[in-house]
UniProtKB/Swiss-Prot annotation:
Active site: 317
Protein name: Nicotinate-nucleotide--dimethylbenzimidazole phosphoribosyltransferase
HAMAP family: CobT
InterPro entries found in the cross-reference section: Nict_dMeBzImd_PRibTrfase (IPR003200), Nict_dMeBzImd_PRibTrfase_bact (IPR017846), Nict_dMeBzImd_PRibTrfase_N (IPR023195), Nict_dMeBzImd_PRibTrfase_sf (IPR036087)
Its biological purpose: Catalyzes the synthesis of alpha-ribazole-5'-phosphate from nicotinate mononucleotide (NAMN) and 5,6-dimethylbenzimidazole (DMB).
PANTHER family to which the protein is assigned, alphabetical: NICOTINATE-NUCLEOTIDE--DIMETHYLBENZIMIDAZOLE PHOSPHORIBOSYLTRANSFERASE (PTHR43463:SF1)
Record keywords: Cobalamin biosynthesis, Glycosyltransferase, Transferase
Gene source species: Shewanella sp. (strain ANA-3)
Molecular function in Gene Ontology: nicotinate-nucleotide-dimethylbenzimidazole phosphoribosyltransferase activity
Amino acid sequence: MPQSVPLFQIEPVSKAQDQLIQQKIDLKTKPPGALGQLESLALQIARIQGAKQLQIVYPTMLVFAGDHGIAAEGVSIAPSEVTRQMVQNFAHGGAAINVFCRQLGFNLEVIDCGILTPVEDAEGIIDQRLGAGTAAIHLEPAMTLACVDKGFAMAQALIERHHQAGCNLVAFGEMGIGNTSSAAAIMAAIMQLDVADCVGRGTGINSETLERKQMLIELALLLHQSAMTGPRQVLACLGGFEIVQMTGAMLAAAERKMLVVVDGFIATAAALVAVSINANVRDYLIFAHRSEEQGHQRMLEHLKAKPLLSLGLRLGEGTGAALALPLIQAAVNFYNQMASFSDAGIEAVV
């Protein structure tokens, strides 16, 4: 029997208290709207948490790693072996995401979703392997639909473990040579766009490689057109093991009313699939930054997302999501701690 797909029961956030929440924000000692995007962020968090005092508890960064069959076609400046080497680097604490998580107070967990060769005896690497890299999407489906469902179930268990530990904010990063190709293909399929509008230079490929990358994605979309009857099928045809598990984890986190912080292009592609599966997940998504990958802005617009940062990042790993945490904490803190006009004995600014 094939594994059944996990059912995600995601409630939309309630807007019943919006007037009271907005009034609390507006009566802080500042002109209305003066804290800009932090105010809309505080409103979003207050809707999710439904509490008088907002909080961030045990913020956790999950970095999902997987390899891609299409990488063998030279669509990236780096070979697939670099995925494993970077996972080792994560385990040794030497990557940018390690540095930022230490600085900012994130609990970091790295999940091997299916790199070509597992890292042996690596402390802190969680084994959730779905295979040794996906198939090449321009030649065959990346994986089976049963594999997608297994990845969702694994992701659901992962999120439940962190939720049981008290975590209420989870951020998403990734590592996988070739995964911008998979993400661009997913974007083109779901948003019904030309591949040229979705494909970017990833880690910095030249124009010749960019043309080859675009051609291979076009072949993949043509090959799987009839099979892509829904978002799970899109993942099976075009996805990466890490994108599958990110998608499932976002759905599971929203189901548990956790804050979901989305990193860059790859993580946003996972969010795009998650929203296609259950539109209510969108209420729980906080988009950390606008990356340099050219398709990212289009996806953000499609998801009606206004990212917190725009720093020219194109690294992945969850680095942008990590850097957004102080802003999220600032939104929580001003909401909880900032005096109202009446508290401070100041005449209200109209």
